[in-house]
Amino acid sequence: MPLCPLLLLALGLRLTGTLNSNDPNVCTFWESFTTTTKESHLRPFSLLPAESCHRPWEDPHTCAQPTVVYRTVYRQVVKMDSRPRLQCCRGYYESRGACVPLCAQECVHGRCVAPNQCQCAPGWRGGDCSSECAPGMWGPQCDKFCHCGNNSSCDPKSGTCFCPSGLQPPNCLQPCPAGHYGPACQFDCQCYGASCDPQDGACFCPPGRAGPSCNVPCSQGTDGFFCPRTYPCQNGGVPQGSQGSCSCPPGWMGVICSLPCPEGFHGPNCTQECRCHNGGLCDRFTGQCHCAPGYIGDRCQEECPVGRFGQDCAETCDCAPGARCFPANGACLCEHGFTGDRCTERLCPDGRYGLSCQEPCTCDPEHSLSCHPMHGECSCQPGWAGLHCNESCPQDTHGPGCQEHCLCLHGGLCLADSGLCRCAPGYTGPHCANLCPPDTYGINCSSRCSCENAIACSPIDGTCICKEGWQRGNCSVPCPLGTWGFNCNASCQCAHDGVCSPQTGACTCTPGWHGAHCQLPCPKGQFGEGCASVCDCDHSDGCDPVHGQCRCQAGWMGTRCHLPCPEGFWGANCSNTCTCKNGGTCVSENGNCVCAPGFRGPSCQRPCPPGRYGKRCVQCKCNNNHSSCHPSDGTCSCLAGWTGPDCSEACPPGHWGLKCSQLCQCHHGGTCHPQDGSCICTPGWTGPNCLEGCPPRMFGVNCSQLCQCDLGEMCHPETGACVCPPGHSGADCKMGSQESFTIMPTSPVTHNSLGAVIGIAVLGTLVVALIALFIGYRQWQKGKEHEHLAVAYSTGRLDGSDYVMPDVSPSYSHYYSNPSYHTLSQCSPNPPPPNKVPGSQLFVSSQAPERPSRAHGRENHVTLPADWKHRREPHERGASHLDRSYSCSYSHRNGPGPFCHKGPISEEGLGASVMSLSSENPYATIRDLPSLPGEPRESGYVEMKGPPSVSPPRQSLHLRDRQQRQLQPQRDSGTYEQPSPLSHNEESLGSTPPLPPGLPPGHYDSPKNSHIPGHYDLPPVRHPPSPPSRRQDR
């Protein structure tokens, strides 16, 4: 199984069990959620004084006024809150309620003991325990030798040498350079300049020095240096036992405690494992975790709470509401639609919102702050509410969302936007509870008394006593410039045209200066009188210290440098003109072009290539053969006849044109072209809407074929089959006959669907019975009369066709198992008249004179038209009747003469299978016909080029009437004609009147489906039965 799905499964699935914050490797993070809570806030109420002023001469300032008190009330609010959640620390995943280490590579033959650290089973090596190479070998086939010196091992996959302590990588051939030791020679010798053992760092002290670090001097003696006894343990290690081994203090390990603890371990001899998570570092001496920014806790397992970030979570986030602050560095993660360092800038221009900023905001522009750049929700100005910020706050409420309450006394009105009271004249204060201060009067105490420099002023008429610095009786004239004080006798000491106060002599500096004597210029960022004004510039390099005019940066303009350059301009003071084409905009700071969707290039001068669109000219999703793609938004414009999101769907039947919006106007089964709506008519119809039938002597598709009838007779408008006059036959009516026959179509007979259902049920029962009696019936036919009237079905020769059915010898009865041709058996000699005529049968009428006496009976041939077939029209015919009526006459030397019968052809009378007429295999070869005695044998093969048409034939009324007149008997012919039962009552579909005496019932040998598709054999001759009583039982 691939490793990636295993990792995802390990990280994503939570098995049974619950994490505990005290469990190892469990960390805490904070998640935000929405909650409804009860919030307290202060609401003002007024308390009237116990006594009020009623004496008009009293100073109103000395009277007690109503006092305002605040009481705590509660309201329900919806706000965002956060809560801690437990999860496995980085490098671990949850399994059965515990956090187990996770290895990025599967430990094939081992187990994961720490994050990305495998403990291999015996005999296996490598980071993932998948190699069984012997020591000193590596590679996928373990056929490469490790090129590592000093018997060093190598990685079984990469061949990288694992150099032991004291040898230099990469090949472990050289010892550590002087002054270095340990693994990879990463530590410096601690021997006061002396060399050390490259493996464990033991010092090689020079003469005169001793100690584990050569830090103990030896005394000089007569016999050399005398050195005190020392132990090799470094870094405070304590010797143990007689072997000189050392017990290392916390943070050190090795034989002489010269190696610091490796990462992840601490304590004495580095035996304790660190438990610091989320990138925290462990102090190798104490094991205390030094957490990375964004995490706290004794194991660095807790993420900074919401709103805090940085080292030890000491910093406060400064992100806009709705944005999230990253705990590590405090960067703001903006919600959709906002950008900027604090997520305060909208991505969409003012007044627009949506994914492409294409939707206009519906907020009242005067009373709304903005609309949300993604979903368009209006942010109302304080004092306004409603979906579109067009509803003012109710009385005594104000603020954002009208959530705050206000209280205004003495007839004051509350301003819905700020909650400030608009007090009645003479009152002031947050709740209009106080009189105007001395020397003021009027609405909001904005008017001063007429002697505004008086010691005292009436709030009504402004009467006053002059103060220092003023002169004349009404205290309206100040001291002259340069003087101040009582009687204006002191001189001012103000520089840079500063003016001193006539009362105190304090200097009022001109804009741009400050100080006791106006001798100092304004500090940077301040301007104006007394440098009291702060520069109000958004994107500037400071402002003018005198009048505060902002010095705008490139790309900005306006009094506060708060307006970006207008469209089409950029640079300092927006003095440069953009050169972007095709609707592109330029960056106001540097003039770079930002192209509109559908264009590209440095100046947006090039459109997207065909088949691409949008800002990045991405691939269109339209079907290139049936549509075009809008270069801006990729919208597919379908060509006529196509529809769908990508124009890959053709118009549904009955529709055409652009967007398939036009309805087809084709009749009689015609279809219309999906692009231009032109009608494609069925054979036999023409005209723009297929409403016109074919003109005389024309037939076929669009009536483009000429009838091939030799005598100028009419032909079928769909198939072109000729309707021959009496005495002629053949596909083109060229064949004459001694005995002429006319086969006339009759009108279809209608019946209700219930009759069709009953007929089908009866037919099914009869078919089962007939199959059981079939073998006996064949034997019963043998030895009967050999004289039959053969009626051969042949297709009429159409324009361009190459086949015709030859006449059939009268001496034989044949049937051909062919889907387009069928042969009727000849009538038998005159038997006794039956008592009952079975079913609807096929009869052939004859009005020709009798044959010579040597003949046993009449030899008649009839060629049926090509449109003889099984047809159905639900509103006219049932499901089991053929739609032609034919007549048959028979004469015998002993009989009374020919008879004529008409009747509808049904599948019971014909014995024909519907499948033989509507078979999907229209091709067959009819083999040789039996030759007559004394006549040369002729072979006839007919290859069928197509199945019979399924369209109902159409005949003009005059042609049908003429055919019916031709079938009327002559008074002198001796022919008896029995009228069709359908001529007077079309509802009697299945009934036939009794036959005249001496006329046998019609017989039709139906074809059976051949076992070889497309090729049919000639079955044995079948003779009609002679006993009439048995014929009636069929």
From Swiss-Prot:
Record field: compositional bias (Polar residues): 972-991
Location of the protein in the cell: Cell membrane; Cell projection, Lamellipodium
Ranges in the topological domain labelled Extracellular: 19-754
Pfam families found in the cross-reference section: EGF_laminin, EGF_PEAR1L
Oligomeric and partner information: Interacts with SHC2 upon its aggregation-induced tyrosine phosphorylation. Interacts (via extracellular domain) with SVEP1.
Protein family according to the UniProt entry: Belongs to the MEGF family.
Protein known as: Platelet endothelial aggregation receptor 1
Species this protein is from: Mus musculus
Lineage start: Eukaryota, Metazoa, Chordata, Craniata, Vertebrata
